Amino acid sequence: MTAQTMQIGNRPCRIYGEAHAEYLLLQMTGEHELQSMESEIAAIAQSAHHFLFAAIPVESWNDALSPWEAPAVWGKQGFGGKAADTLCFLTEQVIPTLKQQYPLPENVKIILGGYSLAGLFALWASTQTDLFYGIAAASPSVWFPGWMEFEQRHPMQ
């Protein structure tokens, strides 16, 4: 399956799949994940479901995906707590643009996924909105300072 690149906001998003999809899969990605993207898409394509997959690049991983500010855990870079901005980008730019460019059904099932800190972002996003049909959090960074306490007080929607 060949990727198309679509500029959404100021980000070059990789789009795979087809219009009229039953599922819209959104994955926040870092540069390190793009090398294995083709095999991930091939595995998803083996299902019997029609899908549209958008790989959304994240530049400042620690800032854009962290739900609140926190000091550095490893190394020197702390966390900027800009997950709300990233979620807003998804809901106000990415999803509307994809729905405009691809004739997706009104009831398309939206699944947000991510690995590591992007997995934590996906879990956090599910506590902020009921927009997502499902969450795929692979090895989420639940070690993030304050996450366990937050998660107990804020159920997934």
PLM features: what roles do these ranges have?
Residues 1-157:
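Non-catalytic cap/lid and distal C-terminal segments of serine-dependent acyl enzymes
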